Amino acid sequence: MRGLNKVMIIGSMCRDPEMRYTPSGKAVTSFAVETRRDWTGPDSERHEESEWFNVVAWGNLAEICKQHLVRGQQVYIEGRLQTRGWEDSEGKRHYRTEIVANEMVILGERRLHHDPQHLAHSAEGDGNNDSD
């Protein structure tokens, strides 16, 4: 039986994206997105909860994210969850779960500067949305 691994989030950029290139020359950009959830409790008191998601984009989408995304901007990200594992220099094992983006849409104005942008970009057909 085939599984499903799909994630869709709408939130605000926590920081400017960081781009690098793999030894084989593939662009990879990483950034974090904060989502917020509001609700009213049984006592009629308002509550707010935030979640922070690590996101990585590859290839052409990585370059587009680096060029157009900035801290404070609202963004839609679609992709899949991936957990990476590695061992540090002291032999300790570490894990990181992140969203591997295959689509990004800039939704509105930056909170830090009122400059509306409405851009949609997809990695489909790019062939560069996987790690080396």
How would you describe each model-predicted region?
Residues 88-106:
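OB-fold/S1-family single-stranded nucleic acid-binding modules
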Residues 8-13, 33, 71-82, 101-104:
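OB-fold and OB-like beta-barrel modules that bind single-stranded nucleic acids
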Residues 9-49, 85, 95:
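Core FKBP-type peptidyl-prolyl cis-trans isomerase
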Residues 1-4, 20-24, 41-46, 91-92, ...:
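Acidic, gly/ser/pro-rich intrinsically disordered tails
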Residues 41-67:
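A beta-strand/beta-hairpin structural motif
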Residues 58-94:
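Beta-rich strand-turn-strand
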